[in-house]
Structures are given as C-alpha cells and as structure tokens.
C-alpha cells in the first residue's frame, strides 16, 4: 500500500451552550460543533474545515408515514451562492432548484446512511446539508457526509451508524486524504469512500485508467482513516451529547401471518421466478401474489400490505438461496455469464454519431453531437469550473420498463447515472488542443432490465467512435452484484446483474474502464458492509466481464472514424494579433455580422468564436463558407502593403484630395492628382462622401500614413466587385493551407473556461 499517515481523532472543547469535537484529516483540522445552531432539529452539527462551513441537520417525524412500503428518507444539499461571495446569475438573483452538483453530493450522503436504519422503519427522515462557506481546498461534500452522520448519531432517530467518508487522491504515486484543489488537478483519481467502523458501504470514483489493485488499495486506505479517525470522534460526540434513541413502531407482520405466507407461496414463487424474460417473470410472480392474497384474505382480513411485504421477503430469500446453494440465477445464467450482446452504429442519418448497445433486455441508444467551443456549458454553482466541454446526459423514460408516469424532466437517478457514465468517458476524451469541439452525448434507455448506466457507457463509446471523436481508448462497463449469507459466510459475486438481482441482492458494484485500467467505479452496499476479499473478487471478475464486452464492441467498430459526419461542423482555427480583434468585430459587431451574412449558405451560417489571445475558431458545415470567412478575416487584419488593391468608402473630402477607408479604422489619402488619369479641378467632380471606389496602395510613409490611387487601380476596376471589404487580390493561401479540421497542439489556444470577446453565428 502506498505510504500515507492515517490521521487520528483530536480533542474536544465545551462551553456552556456548545460542544465541539476536533480531528485531523489530511493534515488539517475538522471541527464538529453542536448546541449552538438549529437547536430545534432532532440533531444538528456545524462542520468547520479550513474556511469551509456546512450546517447539517436531521429531523425525524413522530409517526410512521401511512401507505408506503419503503423507508421515506430525504437528503438535500442546499447550495448558497453567498458561500463563495457571489450573487446568483439567474433573473431572480436567488437560488432555485438544486444544481446537478448538489444532487450528486446529496446522493453521496444518502447512499451510505440508508442501509443503517432499522428494517421496517417508516418514519420520515430528512437530512439537510446547508453550505455556508466554501474553501476550494476543503471539500464540502465530505463535510456534509460526516456532518449528516454525526447529526443522526447524536439525535433521537434510530440509526445504526455512525459512518464516515473521505476523498482519496493519487498524487505522484502517493495516496492523499481530501486533496486540495491543486493536488486534485494532479491526481490520477478522485475516490470517495464511505463506511462504518467495520466495513466499506459506498464507493464513488473517477480515475485516469488506474489498475484494479491500486483502486482496491485506495479504498482500503480511505477506510483506515474512517475507522481510526472519523468514527471514534463521532462516537465520542454521541457519548457526551447524544440523545437517547426514541421508541418507534416498525412495520412488522405477525409471526403467524408470516408462517402462512411461507407455506402458501414458497414453492410457487420458486417456480415463477425462474424465467429468462423479465415481463413474463413479473407476471408470474404477480399471479402468485394475487392467489396468495385471495387464499389468506378470510383468515387474515385487512392484511394486504403485510402479505405483500412478506411475499417480497419470501421471493428475496428464494432468489438468494438458489444463487448461493445451486449457483443458478433467475434467468438460468451461471454466476459469471454475461447476457447476449448486440452492437450497432449509424442508426440515425442526421446526428453526428449514434450507437446502439443491447445486453439482454437492456437497450441503450446513444447519440453524439459536436458543437463549437462556444457551445460549452456555462456553470453557475459553487465549483471553480466555469465551463464544461464534455457532457453526457441520461434519459430513462417510463416505457423502458413497461410503465406509465408523467414526464417531468431528469430526476436524481437520471442525473446520477448520467454523471457516472460521463466520469467513465471523460479520461479518454481528447483535449481541446487536439479536438476543438464541444461534445455532448445523450443516452436514451429504450429497454431496462438492470445495468442501464453501464450500457450507456458502452453505447456512448460506440457513438463517439462513429462520430469521429479521436478518443484515447474505448471504454466498457459492467455491473456486479453480491449475494451473501451472514449466517454461513457463503457468498456469490454476480457478473452483469439484471433488475431482480439488483433489487434483491446485497451490492450494486458498477465498474467502467479501458483495457489499461478503471475510469469509473460506483459501489453501494445494502447490508452493513463488505470485506477486502469480496471487493477484490468483484474487481477482478468485473475486469474479465469488461474485456468480454469490449471485444463485442470492437467487432462492431474497431476505432474512431477518420472523418466527421457531413452534418458536423468543420472548425477552422486561425490566430490574429489581439490588437486586431476590434477590427474583426467592428462597431457593435457590424463587421463580423457582415462576414457571417455574406458567407451564409441557405439557412446555414458560420459560427465565429474569438478568444482573448486572438485565437479564432470558425465553424461551418459548408467548407467553402468557412474558407470564405477565413479569407475575409485574414484580409481585415492584414496590414496594407504597396501594390494591394482595396474597395473602400470615401469618408472625407479636402481641397487636396479624398480620404478613403480601406479597412475598419484605416484610412488613406487619394491625392487630387491620383483621382483620375485626366486633370481634376475639384475633388467633388469625381467622388463624393459615401462613394465606393477601388484604390491601390502606392506608398506607406515613415509615419504610417497610407497614400492611395484611384488612377492606378482603374485598369482593374472592371474586374472588381465593390463590396465595402478588401478585394481578394492579395496573395491567396496555397493549396492545403487553412483547411478545416482539428488544429495541432501548441497553436496557442486558450484553456477551457476562457470566454473571448464574442461568439457569433448560428
């Protein structure tokens, strides 16, 4: 295991009204304080870590919620823009719906605490983490997780914690706890580990193709800090300021009813559940449930909810027994067998890239769209990032599972699954310097029977390669499961779990990566934790499954396409002096808008992005239009030279000649003797203000003044086409120069998050 000193619990300080407890995490002090703020909550803890401050509260309702068959737990992260010294950027200038980041942070806290409430507990519990101050070097998501655990532990709500959580980074070959912002930039992984004193409960990771063994070591390294530092500190809080746990009413059917349900349903459910088809299996199980309800209705009146609960319990026991004792899964597969896989690309004609991935009865259609750098997502949250160049969005419509429900936009599950696939793919996305496009991939789940997030990873890889995105390596993903018998210690690790195995199993362990290593990992335990042995087996078994799936994908498309879709924009990159930017834009955008209008083809316009350093990106579906825009910009920024011919506009008349604007902000003088090859008595006899004339540069004197001639340009005037812009009579680019496409690295482009003076087009 790479070296690193696990931190230890610190000291406690009390006053008349507050109690605070400190510990060292990552070489910095974290303080948990209670008794001063939000005292009417069941439990309240203020977490201080560096300059970051998070208030965590937990409240439990007095009575169970009626009519539910689940534990109604809600975890919310409340981002406050004042925490980073900013005013919200929306029209109302106040916080609105939770951002995607806040939802992901809430899920990080929800997942490890949910398994630790009593079975049958139906009281509402709400955990709220309010971010009051943000220091980028001290992660508020971890503070919220620890604070929520502490608030629940010291409250009167029944909770079988505490849990703790840390971020583990890999910097210069060393594991680092809660890395600073600078360390995170250099880290090979971003691993969140949560667990109890005895076991790991939750893992969430993004990594740059890290080997499985290194990932396992990092998980266990983080758990050591949780076990030896965080848990003792929270337990000390509980011992000194914790409230006695309340007596609650648990949803618990009477023993005689349970016995009757077992006798009536066990054999029938054993037969009904063994069916490879999801819908047929669900219908058979539902039929058994209806029959048992009817048979027991007279003996146990008004017990429908208890019977339904017990039927699920018996079904769970039967599925788990068959897996552990017989090695047989509900659809008849072996423990390591992967469902049949089908892959296809180019299903859609106009989108820039599309890929279909089907594994058993899970089917995902992924679509890739390429945009300009001006299409990057503008972020308005508490993070340091300002823009986002690669996006993956996940949609899970109700028809994918044969259900109906209102379509209200992405929920927490969709946002979480989309972020997981995005994290898996991000390490292989080419940098902006190599591929100056914004990339958006959307995964449409068309059928679902488990592991749709990992199917999204596979489908997105197909779509990216079909679109011609030069990804570093293909990425595949697989979901692993676990069934463990706590009495005997026997367990089975399942490859490619389906929906029923996810619902009735003990673990959902998703692993995505390349042939080289892991790029994303997510694990959730539904029991009190897992051991190193099981984690190692799951990781190694997942690698075997991932390689099998990748082989099927590469048989469909072996590498990224060399050419982009004809409907994708081609990007021409050019560089001008920053001092010339105003010449290209013009007053109020007049010049650049004129370029866009004059290069329009049908309803399609070029898009022009100008960066602060003078880098210009011209995006055009029509190559000729993009090339014309490039030539016009080059003409605008090129300094006049003797012999060059321009079409300009007369701006002033003097007795000795006329001033002509040949470029935005650049005027030259046509002396009266140069107005015509005949004698001119008055300047007004030849030109007037506003006239368009063709002129030739005859001289640029030592003071930079430009002398022009209409007379010398007259032989060429018939061939010119006055347009108020430089004529294309200057040297043209040689064949091969200025062609669109990805520019080479080192072209002086700005980094992400540096918006230029303007983006125009579309």
UniProtKB/Swiss-Prot annotation:
Which residues does the UniProt record annotate as the domain KH? 569-633
GO annotations of cellular component type: cytosol
Compartments annotated for it: namely: Cytoplasm
By its UniProt entry, which Pfam families does this protein fall under? KH_1, PNPase, RNase_PH, RNase_PH_C, S1
Q: Which domain of life is it from?
A: Bacteria
Residue numbers binding Mg(2+): 502, 508
In Swiss-Prot or TrEMBL terms, this protein is called Polyribonucleotide nucleotidyltransferase
Organism name: Symbiobacterium thermophilum (strain DSM 24528 / JCM 14929 / IAM 14863 / T)
